[in-house]
């Protein structure tokens, strides 16, 4: 039961190996092979992906990452008849962000905790499963859930990253290990924290598997590495932040970092100890037209610009798109979208290429909707800024310089320089995050899963003091994120919004939008049937008219959806599939406030639809979550303030601001361990639940500080118990976190 609570179930399905089902697998492949043969998929096959429209061979279906499929068996006229064809329960009830690949009727899906599954795409039958056995204590090395966004396929092998930093190649037919490498170089200059995780999908370009990493919230120096797809040997590496001593790393990035980037940093800021950030945790794109690899580069480490770089310089290559040669990793060009970043405005969001008519000529461009709220059009071959316009409301900048694309800052938004709080829109979660956008060549529109989640930026008082195994942002963790007063919280809740924004890139203007109940919804798929598919945080899966946003179909998936759908052919029939499971930093940190998007209890699955689906409805499940347990009546009020400080420093990022959970991980107010000092210390201090992702913290806090947290939790349980009990009596379920 405890393992299920922490979203990592130890079950029979978790123990399946390639060997136990090899015979079934081989017979299954014999029946699934088709004329749409992609089993030998390499770069040429992916370049000509539209010759194999029934497959989904790479992360964005094509190298352009447009997430458009020409399939049109399912279209506007018949999508209302869509039915559930099959579902497959997963063994991790946490956030699922993966894009499944589908090659000749076989689906390859990565799930939370870096597991890989091969599934019969027509029936949902599990063919093989691979568990890389990521250690449970790695969970607290990442900011934003133990998610995995997908895999890559090349020449009969499937590749994926693991949360503990490995890159793994498996035989696609058998699921057997071909090779495994550690992507984090032990000898490199990476900062004191060296807190790295891998949750993004690798990309393959010219026989090289390219993967990045995350970790800037703790302390990391960003880089990507290209590995030989056949052998796993390192081909090249490119760092996205300078060496703190401006010395060579003996990598492809040495020249540009030493001669161009280093000069944009203070030589003595905290970045020299923390790594500087700039991790590439999502978007890596190969463009065969320009023959370039594009990197979307992340935020600074620490976030605080004054502490990080003494308030000096643009800090290359933070918040940038960087173009490299695929064979060598040699730098070609860069465009920095957010100089002087202090808002966590990453540029790792999906990079898309397309051919766009501009001023009477067709240009090959990058279109990009990063966190900072602006929609950029950039020349894909040269990095020249063409145009930019905000696709959501922003208050940190009044616009972009029309010639250079540099932001025109609101002086008040430079909170690390003013020393004053800043209520930023968008906040750190961005106007657009990891949820994939799509483009339809039929409508000419880009469809952005946009959102508004403000953030209260407050400087850390007394200078920057990093903590091991904790977020090191240079901000006051007791005040950031969510306002304290009831009135401010009411206003904050009203500011939580989510939409599909249909954006016309030629006009740099919104065409129309679809309003959602709140933010943190799933990615978008566009199809030749003039449809958009998207799952929502409230557990509904929708199909919309791509021309005007009309809602044409919806299905109750019972759990929030943050992953993007895919579509494919199996036995000549079109299917639409998506991974189901809500998670990530929004419900982790915002906790009770995240419930405004709609309450669901996680039951992670893959679900697939067809026009003649016969699976029937999903099994009914508990929709109220764990019932509150009446807490102990007594607590030491003298200890709760320090308990709050320790909780916000070490616990809130997973268990919710002010100790209110959103249903993904345990809500500690109702944990039985808070009733007993020894039991609580065994979990928090000694790591009794390390195998399930709850690491030990006796190296970070002493027993007195851990007990202070327990006293704080008892206080919060008493303050909120009756409200939570009453809420479960209401038809609307559990309310948002409000006094």
Curated annotation (Swiss-Prot):
Enzyme Commission (EC) number: 1.1.5.5
Function: Dehydrogenase component of the alcohol dehydrogenase multicomponent enzyme system which is involved in the production of acetic acid and in the ethanol oxidase respiratory chain. Quinohemoprotein alcohol dehydrogenase (ADH) catalyzes the oxidation of ethanol to acetaldehyde by transferring electrons to the ubiquinone embedded in the membrane phospholipids. The electrons transfer from ethanol to membranous ubiquinone occurs from pyrroloquinoline quinone (PQQ) to one heme c in subunit I (AdhA), and finally to two heme c in subunit II (AdhB).
Organismal lineage: Bacteria, Pseudomonadati, Pseudomonadota, Alphaproteobacteria, Acetobacterales
Superkingdom of origin organism: Bacteria
Pfam families to which the protein is assigned, alphabetical: Cytochrome_CBB3 (PF13442), PQQ (PF01011), PQQ_2 (PF13360)
Subunit structure, interactors included: The alcohol dehydrogenase multicomponent enzyme system is composed of a dehydrogenase subunit I (AdhA) and a cytochrome c subunit II (AdhB).
Membrane-protein topology: Peripheral membrane protein
Transmembrane domains' residue ranges: none
Major subcellular location class: membrane
Entry protein name: Alcohol dehydrogenase (quinone), dehydrogenase subunit
Annotated organism of origin: Komagataeibacter europaeus
Cytochrome c domain span: 635-739
